[in-house]
Structure formats: C-alpha cells, structure tokens
Swiss-Prot record:
Enzyme Commission identifier(s): 6.2.1.-
Listed name of the protein: Nonribosomal peptide synthetase flvI
Residue span(s) of domain Carrier: 552-628
Region of interest called Adenylation, as start-end residue ranges on this chain: 33-417
Encoding gene, per UniProt annotation: flvI
Length: 1071
C-alpha cells in the first residue's frame, strides 16, 4: 500500500513539475547587451593584458570578419589551440559571431588525440595563440591570433545571422569506444545554463571569475561565459602561476569567484585568500572535510552536472547549511527525473535510488557524428511523459544514481557504469581499456578501475590477465616478474602517445584470471576490493622498488622535504627514502602543486616542473632555493682585492680611468671567474664576438613608461648588469661594479645601428649590456661575461616582477666569487685524487693544428627518455664515456662538463641572476666487467662528489698536480646537459628571437643536450681541426643514441657485452 501511495505521489509530481522555458537568444547577443550596458567595464584581466567590454567586442568582431572572409560560416567547426591568455576570449566570441562552432584543444594532449578530434568534427580551421602556432600548423589550416592579424580585418565584410538553436561549441570527453566523443551544445542551451543559474551561483557584475580549468575540461568554456554573460570580469593567470603560484595569483588578480575541483581546493589555504568570497566546487565528490575546511571562510557552493548539460544540472547553493556532503542541491535550468536504472520508462518513488534523467533548455543536442551513442544516452517520450506537452523534448540519461530527498533536493549515490572522474577529469574506463589492450596486443583481457587505496584521491589501476600461468597457481594477483615490468614500461610509453597523462594507468597488476559475477560479467568490485587489501610494500612491488636499498634523508633540508612528501602523499616517514621517485610513490600534478605550496611555507621555492624533473628528495634538495643554507658573512666592498699588490687608491684610480667615471661611482670590485675570462679576454686573440642579441615582441598592453621604471629597478637590484671588466695590471683582469644607470633607449634611425645584429658591446671598462625599445619591440645586447644560460631568464623575471609592482631584492655576485675562489684542503685533495694516474691523452685529438678551431660543423640527434632510477644527465654522461672509450681505446675517460653550480652554499643563489656556470674537467673510469647499472650508480656517486667540490675554477685545478695540468683546460670534448629554458622566460618575454655571434666550438668537440621531460635534443659540434675520415662522427652520434636507449632498457647487461649486443664493430679497426 505504501509503495502504491508513493507511486501515486510520483505520478502527481510528474503532472505538477514544469520544465524551464527555452531562452531563444544567441551567446554573442547576450554579450552585446552587456557591452551596451557597461562598455568601459573590465571584461578580461589577464597576465598578458586587460580588455574592457567594448574592447573585447571590437577585437572579437575584427577577428570574426577575418574568419568570415576565409570561409567560416554557419556550422563551421573551428578548434582553438591556446595557452591561457586574453586571446582565448577574443577567439571564442569571434567564432560565434562568424556563425562557427568552437572547441578547445588542450595543447598538452598527445598529437594523435588532437588530430582525431579535428578529423572527427571536420575542422575547417584551427585558431591558435602565437605560442601554439607550430602545434596548430600540424593540425591543418590555421591562423595565429594577434594584433597584427586583427589589423588586416576587412571592414566591409558582413557577418551572418545566427539562430539560437545553432551549435555554439563542442565539448570533448572520454569515450568508451576508445575515441573521445564530442558533445554538441547550442547557443540557447548555454544561455539557459548561465542565466537560469546565475542567482543561485551568486554571479553578477561584481564577480571576478578565475580561469583555472584545463582546456580538456568543459568547465573551461563555462568559466568565460559565467563572467561575460552576467557582466563580470574574467581573471586569467599565466600557466606558470596557475601551476606554481595559484594562491598568490588569485590574490593578485583580486578573484572573488572561483570554480575548483575539491582536489585543487585542498592545495590552497583558505585563510590566505581574503579576496575570495564565493568558492564553487564540482567535478568530483565533495567531502565533509572539504566543507569543514572552506565553509568558515567563503560562501561554499557545490555544483553537479555532466558536460551534456550546459552550465550545471544541480546547485547546492550553501554547503555551510547542509547535513550531508552528498547533497547536490536543486535544479534551476533543467528538470530532474529519477528512473529505474534498468528501465527508463519507470519512475521510482521519492526516496528510492534510481538513475538521474535530465530534461530542459540547457540540454546539449547529442554527440557529433555519433548517432548510435546519442541514441543510447538521449531519449524522447518516456511512458511517464505520455500525453504531456514536454513528451517530445529530448532527455539525457546521466548514468548517475541518485535519490530525491523530502525537500526536493538530490542525494548523489554513485555511477552505474564505468565512467569515473580523476581530479575532475571525466574518464570512460572503456576507452583506457581499449587502448591498453591495443598496445599490449594478443587480445589480452584488461580491466581498468579507479581505486583510492588509502590516498586522498583515486588513481587508475590496470588489471591484466597473464598468459601461461601454471595450473597450480590459485592466487588472483601475481607477483610481477622482470618480463611483466618490461612490458609495462613499454605499455606506459605507448599509452602516453595515445592518451592524456591523466588517462594513463598509474599501476599495473598481473592477475591469474578475470573474476566474474554470477551473471557472467567481470567482477570489477572484487578487483577493487582485492587491490585495497594489498600492503604498501606489495603495491610498491609493481613499481619495481621492492629490492631497492633505502637510504634515509641525511641533511636538515632533506629531512624537511621528507616531511612535506609524507604530508602530501599520505605516507609514513620511514616509507620515503632520499632517492625514492616522486611518481612511483604516487605523486601526481595536483600533489606537486600542493608540495610547491607547502614548500613555500618552509622557505623552499619549487615549481611543478622541477618536482617532476628532479623527482627524488636528494635531487630536489640540490636544486631548490632555501634560506637554510649556511650563513654567509657580510662582505665589505673591495674585500676580495685586499691582498692585491697594488694599493687601494691605485686600484680605484685604474678602474676610474678605464671606465671613465669618478672614484665615487665605483661600488665594488673583485676578481673575475674563469667563465668571464673565457668569454671576454681569451676571444680577443681570435677577434671573436661573445655578444648575445635578443629581440622580444611584447604584449600590446605593455606600458613603455612602466617598463622603463621596471628596467631601472632591475639594474639597481642586479649589480652584475652594471659590471665592467678592467685590466688592473698586464694580463690581470678584475670586474668592477659601477653606480650608473643603463638607459632604456627609444630606438629610431639615429641610434638603431647600435642595436644591429653582430654589434659587439665588448670593451675594457665599457658597459656590457645595452637595451632599447621601439614600439612593442624590446631589444637587448648583452655580453657573455655577465650572464649564463640560467641567469638570463632570471633577469627578465626581475623585469617582469618589477613591472607588476613587486619589490626586488638586491643580488650581489661577490659572495659567489669568493666561494668559487676558495681552495680549502679537502677541495684541493679531491681534485688531486680525481686525476691521479691519468695519462693525459685527449679525445678527440687535433688532426690538423693549422685549421681554425672555431670553424665548426654540427650534427644533431634525438633521445627518448625513460623515467627510471637514473637521471637523464647520469645516463648521458655514462653513454658519452662508453662511446669515447670505444673510439679512444681506453676505459679511463676524461672530458669537460658544464656545471651550473646553483647548489652553492650562497643564500638565494638558485634564484639569482648571476653567471655561476663553470667548465670543469671530469673523469669517468668505466668497469667493463660490471653491469651498466653498476657503472651508472658509480657515476651517480661521482656527480654528488663533484657537486660538493665544484666551487673552483679550472685554472686553479690546473695548478694542483701534473695530472691536473694535463687535463684542465686541455680536454678535447665538452659536455653540456641543460634543461630547455624556453619556458623559463616570464610570459611577457616569451616571444623572442636570439642571435649569437660567438664561437660555436672553441674545443675539438662540443656536445650539447637540451632536456625536456620525455626527450632530449643533441647538438654535436666539431671543430674543423677535428673533422677527418679517420673519425666517422656520424657513426659516433649513431652509437651514442643506440647506447643511451639500450642502457635504459637493459641496465643489467655487462658493459663488456654491450658492443656485441648492439652489433657495433670496433671503431678503431680499419673500415
């Protein structure tokens, strides 16, 4: 009887509920209303500029006319490939005004996935930012959006009328068939999804909305329109600030309204966000801990909804007043029905659990070019709507199980299928399974599940049925053998070529058989439960860490870092060793953001890329900036010249005469480093130019007066920019810091010649940097004596920070110079011991001394990097030593290395814009009777020892012993391994051209390796005096690549067998 009464009430409810009405208006029309109402109000506040509503309207219309001229019309699909920028908003509106349909492309996706997305929608053209134009070019016809392009807009080009029911955008999500599926959303659906929801979401003209969501997430569209359709302001941080400095970015942009997934919100400290008034959480389940953390500080709102429903489906408008975190609130733009999960023609009674079905004006149209999938998810005319005027409207089956509470709000239960969310990203497990089966081959059974296993957030686990299991085996989970681990390493690499990183399983479990339910289906629940029963030690076995000897953190810095790792990863301290891998312990990008944020509270300054690049506590602690390094005694000016044979008055007068300044203008003076000597004095012998010319195209919003002030502040705070080289006595040089300004010149015909390519700023006593500005072009000429590869981006960081109103710290170079010139007994003995017994043979030998060593040829190569127990630098060094040993006929190899020396015990040295680099000799003694792993491990120890004793110049090493003299400054090969610093420049200086006219190879052979996270580019330059038929350098480089890749796959092969394994003949035998 009770059930019949409940069913009766449900039927009555069905008659009473009304579906919200369609709002038949286009997105750009709603936006234009805001333009008329608040023409001069801020619409976009971004790292690269600001736009009012009027300016955004003008720019988007200009771009729309260009698109129309190029054939974009009603229904044309136009993907957008941008880094976070104000130009994103311009491009979105322009496509809509031209009648087109846009979609976002996440630039970090694998190229194959982006290509599929463009093919799937038959993309007419790709719009990109300038920084992504190269990627867009690979995807088809493209346009790079910038001010120069808008200047070509045809004023007479008519724009088409657009109907509200036309498609506006496509949101791509994971698809169970192995391919992403595109959700087609109309103008009127998006308008309804925004305007029906604005009040319960507290959106209005005062809202300053954060742009944070990945372009892979449908919320990225909504963030823009949440702001622009209600008259608010879109606040866009740079990608660097988004990843590494989110809390400060929110405050700097004065964000008061933000959508974040709970996983991201947990990274932030609510007490440090006074500007934030409304926090909207969604994308994944909200916990009571999230509510307790945030509701005392902000108005906490929860939203729920699949991408198929524009805006959001339900809103919990005040989480501070609900009893359960699972209460997802009420619908405003749609009507929610709850049906039997196995039969959508049957409504369930109030309070019963069923599948949520959505109906209303914010519903999407279906899936692009996928009628079969659309028919499964979208339905019309269910029995319980028969005879009603809404019966013919489309409804969407969400696949989510919910129940309706007595007040009409909804309580979320779970998914009914294999769709999951990881860090807010929607994933169809079937798509991951499809690709995993494909790369494994052999029709292997694979089940992928999202499992928490004691962590704050879920991760993907792949369960793989293993062939050829002995009949006696009864265990469901099998211990991973070496063969299984090798297959998984290959599988991961191949999956990353097909899927975004968040869709690649983190853990792979070998299973005896696929368990099934009584109905014959795969028993996913049992696999999840069995996995959660594994101990951490057992889980680590699947990362290949179970046999590793753990060395606990040693130093104070390492112990602090260990505590931070434990907090982020939810591990006990004893589980984290100094050389454990961040990823292998469960770290991901969100965890890295949290680690970077926590590290700041300990005065450690990390970035997300650094955490993944250095990946172990020991490596991180060698590369972080910290204020716990040893105290440096304050230095008085001229302290490093106290022992000079000349009296102080003579020194000052010599400096004043050569620099043509008064003695009062001399701030300090101290010895020059070997790098400075090599870059300034030595090249005079060959008439060489070591001046670097940089030209930057600045964002159009940059204010010249403000930039001039920022440059003056940078010069004042960086004495190295005011440094000049002085010849104190014959062949004895020092550097002097002069109290003088370096003007930012306005460039015109009268002074342009001073900034032409190939101009050399070098000169004894002369300034070594020159800067000019012409329109939005910033030009710098700077001599290598006052910068190195890592310090130069820091100069531009300081300019950018000063431009944004930040104070700059005064950075002195003298403490580092003192450290590099100190030669204590342990350091002296280290270098003497290092080269004891070396016979002094140089490789490659100079074959024709009459040839100029500066003239050179270049060969290039490529390495694919596998992340394992060894750093890329470690593997490159050992690889080079091996190949040199084959060509040189000895296992005792010496070559030069470029050392950044940023781990010096100087406060803030890692973040200081001073040239710390040195070229030092190095020696690797290979053991052919041991494995490659043994030789790599021995070199790891060698690297650590070098870092402890690198505070020395090569000319000082040369004086220590006859063996040292034989190698210091006389080695034939120089190796430079360095990260690709293209992204190290701040956003306003990203678009640049660099021209360098110095010698490319003053040594016999220079090998430069530029590292990115997954690969390395090799440049091998050889002086003309080295090139000869005896040495086949193309073959040398081929061997180098082959050895490097072999080492990664087979580290347990003995070195003496390596050449035979690779089928490489003896290079010293006749060809």
């Amino acid at each position: 009887m009770a059930k019949d009464q409940s069913m009766s009430r449900t039927a009555s409810l069905c008659q009473e509920i009304t579906v919200p009405k369609t709002i038949p208006v286009c997105i750009q029309d709603v936006f234009y209303r805001r333009v008329l109402e608040q023409h001069d109000a801020p619409a976009v506040c971004a790292w690269d500029g600001e736009l009012t509503y009027g300016e955004l309207d003008d720019k988007s219309s200009s771009l729309a006319r260009i698109l129309a001229q190029k054939g974009i019309h009603r229904g044309s699909f136009v993907p957008l490939c941008f880094d976070r920028s104000l130009w994103t908003a311009v491009a979105m509106l322009a496509v809509l005004k031209a009648g087109g349909v846009f979609c976002f492309l996440e630039p970090k996706y694998p190229l194959a996935r982006l290509e599929h997305m463009c093919r799937h929608i038959n993309a007419k053209m790709v719009l990109s930012g300038e920084s992504r134009s190269e990627l867009a070019r690979k995807l088809g016809e493209h346009l790079a959006v910038n001010e120069d392009l808008l200047a070509t807009s045809p004023s007479d080009q008519e724009l088409v009328d657009v109907a509200p029911n036309q498609a506006a955008y496509v949101a791509f999500t994971s698809g169970s068939t192995g391919k992403p599926k595109g959700i087609l959303v109309s103008h009127q659906a998006l308008v309804a999804g925004i305007l029906y929801n604005d009040k319960p979401m507290y959106l209005n003209r005062t809202s300053r909305v954060l742009s944070f969501a990945s372009f892979a997430f449908d919320v990225s569209f909504l963030e823009h329109f949440w702001a622009l359709l209600v008259g608010g302001c879109m606040c866009i941080p740079s990608e660097s600030d988004r990843e590494n400095n989110l809390l400060e970015a929110i405050e700097n942009l004065q964000v008061n309204w933000a959508f974040l997934t709970p996983s991201v919100a947990r990274v932030l400290n609510p007490t440090k966000l006074p500007s934030l008034r409304h926090l909207i959480m969604g994308g994944e389940p909200i916990t009571q801990t999230d509510i307790d953390m945030w509701s005392p500080h902000v108005h906490l709102i929860g939203v729920y909804g699949p991408a198929e429903c524009a805006g959001c489906t339900t809103i919990q408008s005040d989480y501070g007043k609900v009893e359960s975190a699972a209460n997802i609130g009420f619908p405003y733009a749609v009507t929610c029905w709850i049906v039997d999960e196995n039969n959508h023609n049957v409504l369930v009674p109030t309070g019963s659990i069923g599948e949520l079905v959505v109906q209303g004006p914010s519903l999407s149209e279906g899936y692009v070019n996928d009628p079969e999938q659309s028919a499964k998810s979208y339905i019309t005319n269910p029995l319980w709507l028969s005879g009603s005027k809404e019966a013919e409207q489309q409804l969407y089956k969400t696949g989510d199980l919910v129940r309706r509470l007595s007040d009409g709000s909804l309580h979320f239960i779970s998914r009914k299928d294999t769709q999951v969310k990881i860090n807010g990203q929607r994933i169809e497990l079937g798509e991951v399974e499809h690709h995993t089966r494909a790369v494994l081959g052999g029709n292997r059974e694979v089940i992928v599940e999202a499992v928490k296993a004691g962590r704050p957030s879920s991760s993907l686990v792949a369960f793989i049925v293993t062939d050829n299991i002995p009949q006696s085996s009864t265990e469901l989970f099998l211990a991973p053998d070496a063969g299984f681990k090798d297959r998984i390493n290959t599988t991961k690499s191949l999956l990353r070529e097909r899927l975004p990183d968040y869709m690649v399983p983190e853990t792979y479990i070998s299973i005896n058989h696929l368990p099934s339910t009584v109905t014959g289906k795969a028993d996913r629940k049992r696999l999840r439960e069995q996995f959660t029963l594994l101990t951490r030690a057992q889980i680590k076995a699947y990362f290949g860490l179970e046999d590793k000897v753990k060395v606990m953190p040693l130093t104070e810095i390492e112990l602090k870092m260990q505590r931070l790792w434990a907090k982020v990863l939810n591990l006990d301290l004893h589980e984290i060793a100094r050389d454990d891998d961040w990823v292998s312990l469960g770290g991901d990008s969100l965890g890295a953001m949290q680690l970077a944020s926590l590290a700041r509270s300990e005065q450690f300054f990390l970035t997300v890329p650094e955490i993944f690049r250095h990946k172990t506590i020991s490596m991180l602690c060698q590369n972080i900036k910290t204020d716990v390094s040893e105290t440096i005694e304050e230095m008085k000016p001229f302290a490093l010249l106290c022992d000079h044979e000349l009296e102080s008055d003579r020194i000052l007068q010599t400096i004043a005469d050569q620099c043509q300044v008064s003695q009062n203008s001399i701030e300090d003076a101290y010895p020059i480093t070997s790098l400075q000597l090599d870059a300034s004095i030595i090249p005079i012998q060959w008439g060489l130019n070591y001046t670097l010319r940089l030209e930057f195209k600045l964002p159009p919003t940059v204010d010249p007066a403000q930039l001039t002030l920022a440059w003056e502040m940078t010069v004042a705070s960086n004495p190295v920019l005011r440094t000049r080289i002085v010849e104190l006595t014959k062949d004895h040089y020092i550097q002097a810091v002069i109290r003088s300004k370096i003007p930012l010149e306005n460039l015109d015909s009268s002074n342009m010649a001073r900034y032409e390519p190939a101009v050399d700023v070098w000169g004894i006593g002369k300034p070594l940097v020159r800067v000019g500005l012409q329109a939005n072009r910033f030009v710098m000429l700077i001599h290598h004596a006052i910068y190195d590869g890592q310090s130069l981006p820091l100069v531009f960081r300081d300019i950018s920070n000063a431009y944004q109103g930040q104070k700059l710290a005064l950075i002195h170079f003298a403490p580092f110079v003192r450290w590099s010139k100190s030669l204590d007994a342990p350091k002296r003995q280290f270098w003497i011991d290092k080269f004891a017994g070396f016979d002094g043979r140089v490789f490659p030998p100079v074959l024709d001394p009459s040839l100029d060593p500066v003239e050179s040829r270049e060969l290039t190569g490529h390495l694919n990097i596998v992340h394992d127990a060894f750093t890329a630098t470690n593997k490159i060094r050992v690889t080079l030593a091996i190949v040199i040993s084959w060509h040189h006929g000895t296992n005792d190899v010496v070559f030069g290395g470029v050392f950044a020396r940023r781990s010096a015990p100087i406060p803030d040295i890692i973040d200081s814009a001073v040239p710390t680099t040195a070229m030092l000799p190095d020696r690797i003694k290979l053991d052919p009777d041991e494995t490659l792993r043994y030789n790599l491990e021995r070199d790891q120890d060698n690297i650590l020892s070098l870092m402890l004793h690198e505070g020395i110049d090569d000319r000082d090493i040369e004086q220590l012993s006859p063996e040292c003299e034989a190698v210091a400054c006389k080695y034939g090969t120089l190796l430079a391994v360095q990260p690709d610093l293209a992204t190290a420049y701040p956003e306003m200086f990203r678009e640049r051209d660099m021209q360098y006219y110095g010698p490319i190879c003053a040594l016999n052979a220079l090998m430069q390796c530029y590292l990115s996270p997954e690969s390395a580019t090799i440049s091998l330059r050889l002086s003309e005096s080295t090139m000869d038929g005896v040495y086949h350098w193309g073959r040398f480089l081929d061997e180098f690549e082959a050895v490097f890749h072999f080492i990664q796959k087979n580290p347990d092969v003995k070195l003496c067998y390596l050449r035979r394994q690779l089928d490489i003949p003896n290079p010293r035998s006749p060809a």
